[in-house]
């Protein structure tokens, strides 16, 4: 092998080693947040997560009052029951009498 070929081979090998070494280094995303590797889905999938861990005590403190407010209260169910029975009476009267009696309908709706 000629000395120029050896020099060319060493140059190519050194370029390959430096290129592979520079690609292997990871960018510190805490310092370089706008680097392309630190943005988007690729950053979320790889490596360490910067998110805060789940706090179950805080979650419970926030969701418990909301869930309790969704439970039906006794006065709400009584009110709904009264409204349904009233609607049932109005429908029974309307179906049993011929149509065209607007005065009776107005009276029933104001009960």
Swiss-Prot record:
Residues 1-24 form the signal peptide. Keywords: Cleavage on pair of basic residues, Disulfide bond, Neurotoxin, Secreted, Signal, Toxin. One of its GO terms (molecular function) is toxin activity. The keyword Secreted applies. Residues 44-111 form a propeptide. Disulfide bonds join 29-38. It is found in: Secreted. Its main location: secreted. Expressed by the venom duct. GO terms for cellular component: extracellular region. Belongs to the elevenin family. May mimic the function of prey elevenin neuropeptide. In vivo, intracranial injection in mice induces hyperactivity. Monomer. The cysteine framework is C-C. Negative results: has no effect on six different human nAChR subtypes including alpha-1-beta-1-epsilon-delta-epsilon/CHRNA1-CHRNB1-CHRND-CHRNE, alpha-3-beta-2/CHRNA3-CHRNB2, alpha-3-beta-4/CHRNA3-CHRNB4, alpha-4-beta-2/CHRNA4-CHRNB2, alpha-7/CHRNA7 and alpha-9-alpha-10/CHRNA9-CHRNA10, when tested at 1 uM. This is Elevenin. It comes from Conus ebraeus (Hebrew cone).
């Amino acid at each position: 092998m000629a000395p120029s070929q050896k020099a060319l081979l060493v140059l190519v090998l050194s370029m390959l080693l430096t290129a592979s070494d520079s690609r292997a280094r990871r960018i510190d995303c805490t310092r370089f947040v706008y680097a392309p590797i630190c943005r988007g889905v690729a950053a979320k999938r790889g490596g360490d997560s910067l998110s805060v861990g789940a706090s179950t005590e805080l979650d419970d403190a926030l969701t418990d009052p909301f869930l309790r407010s969704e439970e039906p209260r006794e006065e709400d169910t009584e009110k709904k029951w009264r409204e349904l029975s009233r609607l049932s009476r109005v429908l029974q009267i309307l179906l049993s009498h011929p149509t065209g009696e607007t005065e009776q309908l107005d009276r029933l709706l104001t009960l």
